[in-house]
């Protein structure tokens, strides 16, 4: 993941400085898409394993999140 982000930043700097070739532009788009998909997958994983509790210790996790968590457990 760090390598992908490093390369994205490297291409971005080059784009601002001198521009990118067609191949580099395609690589940049592919890397950005890959990074975004990976990031979203990680975020989904974190959220699906999250429980929200108020000051009184009551579960206040939104219903939509609870439903998604139940579906995930049933699919395993």
Curated annotation (Swiss-Prot):
Localization annotation: Cytoplasm
Alphabetically ordered keywords of this record: Cytoplasm
Residue ranges that the Swiss-Prot or TrEMBL entry lists as coiled coil: none
Keyword Membrane listed: no
GO cellular component: cytoplasm
Similarity section: Belongs to the UPF0291 family.
Protein name: UPF0291 protein BC_1827
Species this chain originates from: Bacillus cereus (strain ATCC 14579 / DSM 31 / CCUG 7414 / JCM 2152 / NBRC 15305 / NCIMB 9373 / NCTC 2599 / NRRL B-3711)
């Amino acid at each position: 993941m760090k390598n992908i982000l490093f390369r994205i930043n490297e291409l971005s700097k080059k784009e601002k400085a001198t521009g990118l070739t067609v191949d580099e532009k395609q690589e940049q788009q592919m890397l950005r898409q890959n990074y975004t998909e990976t990031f979203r997958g990680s975020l989904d994983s974190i959220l699906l394993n999250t429980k929200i509790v108020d000051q009184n210790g009551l579960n206040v996790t939104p219903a939509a999140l609870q439903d998604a968590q139940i579906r995930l457990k049933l699919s395993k």
